[in-house]
Amino acid sequence: MKPAIVILCLFVASLYAADSDVPNDILEEQLYNSVVVADYDSAVEKSKHLYEEKKSEVITNVVNKLIRNNKMNCMEYAYQLWLQGSKDIVRDCFPVEFRLIFAENAIKLMYKRDGLALTLSNDVQGDDGRPAYGDGKDKTSPRVSWKLIALWENNKVYFKILNTERNQYLVLGVGTNWNGDHMAFGVNSVDSFRAQWYLQPAKYDNDVLFYIYNREYSKALTLSRTVEPSGHRMAWGYNGRVIGSPEHYAWGIKAF
C-alpha cells in the first residue's frame, strides 16, 4: 500500500476514534443544534452514526429536550429519520406517539383538559360538513378512530387528519364566531390548507402531548368550554394563545 494511502486511512480512522471519545453532552448539543436550525440531513446523519455506535441515549436525551422546549422541529426531525430509512431510531429513541403518527396507525385524539375523544357528528351542517366534537361518552368505537397522513413541503411536515370511520378529513370552517374562533368539521375534499395541520410536541407531567395547529389559520384545535346537553364539547380553531398550557390546549395521541 502506498504511503499516502496509508496516511489517509490512518487520518480517517483517527477522526472516527476522536468522535467516539467526544463526551455525550457535546454530542447532544451538536445534534440538538442541527435539529433546531432545521439542518435535518445533518441531524439524520449524526443520529445514524450515534445509533450505530450504540449511543442511542444521546438521541433520546435530545428528543426529550426538544419536547420539553416545545420545539416543532422535533416533528420534522422524526419524519426525516422515518423517511430516510431510520424507522428503528424513531421506534427506539422517540416516544411511542411518533411511531403511531408516522406509521399511519389508527389513533385516538384525546383532549387532555377534558379527557374526551375527537369524533364527527352523524349530521351534516350545510356545505361545511360534519361538525367535529369531543364525545362525552364514546372513547372506543370506530367513530373516534383517526390517522395522520404526513406531507412534506418547504422543509416542514404537515398532516391531513383522516377520520377512518367516515373517511373524511378534519378542516376548519371559513366563518368565525364572535371570538374569532373557527369551527372544525369533517369533509370529503382536501384541496385547501384548511385541511392541513402541524403539530407541536409538549410535555405535561409524564405525558407527551401535542398542540395541533391549522395550516391556513395558525389556530390551535381545542374543545369548547360550553358543554352540550349530550355531554359533548364542540371543536374549534382557537383564536388565542395556547403555548405554555398543554394541560388546557394540547391533545394526547393514543393507539386505537
UniProtKB/Swiss-Prot annotation:
Chief site of localization: secreted
Tissue and organ distribution: Detected in larval hemolymph (at protein level).
UniProt entry keywords in alphabetical sequence: Lipoprotein, Secreted, Signal
Region forming the signal peptide: 1-17
GO CC entries: extracellular region
Subcellular location: Secreted
Annotated S-S bridges: none
Domain of life: Eukaryota
Family named by the database record: Belongs to the 30 kDa lipoprotein family.
Other comment: This lipoprotein belongs to the group of structurally related '30 kDa proteins' that comprise major protein components of the fifth (and last) instar larvae and of pupae.
Name this polypeptide is given: Low molecular mass lipoprotein 3
Species the sequence originates in: Bombyx mori (Silk moth)
Gene: LP3
